[in-house]
C-alpha cells in the first residue's frame, strides 16, 4: 500500500497482552497461519506477526520493563503506550518504508538507534505526536518490499493485500502535524469514535465480509 511522497506501509502494530493470546481471535476468522515471532534485544519487547500479501500486523508486548524504560528506549514511549493501552493511550503504530529511493517522511522526526540494529542505522520516530495518536516510525534502511504472498497462503482466509488503514480516534482534538501529513499523503486515514479502533481493508473487498475483533482486539477487518 503506497501513498504520496514516496512512502508505503510496512506494517501496523497493536499493543497486546504478553505472548499475544489475542492471536486466537485472528485465527478464529481464518488468519491462522503460523505467526512470525521475535524478541527485540535490548528494547524489552517481543512480537508475533500475522502476514498479509504486502504487509503485516504486529502484535507487540513488553517482556522486560527495565529495558523498555531504559534511557535508550524510553523516548519511544513503548512502555507508556503498552502500560496505558486500555486507559487512553492509542495502542497502534504505523511502520513506514520508502517506496522510492531517498524518500523521507513529510514531518519532523528523531532517530532511535536500538542495539539490535547495526551501527549507523536508525528508526525515525515522528516528533511531537501525543500518546492518544498512533506511533509513527520510518525505516529508511529497508530494501525492496518483502513478498509475503506465499506466507499469506498459509491462512485459511485469503484476504489479499492490505489496501487501506483507518484509525478512529476518540475526542475532538485536531490531528498532530505528523498525522495530518501522513493522512494527506494517502498512507493512512483518521476518523472519530468513542474508542481507538484500527480498521484494515483488504484486497478489493469483493467478498463483502467484515470481522469485528472487539473486545479482544480493537480491530475491524474488511475483505
Label every PLM stretch briefly:
Residues 33-41:
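Conserved catalytic-core motifs of GNAT/GCN5-like acyltransferases
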Residues 2-9, 14-32, 44, 51-223:
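Glyoxalase I/VOC metalloenzyme domain signal
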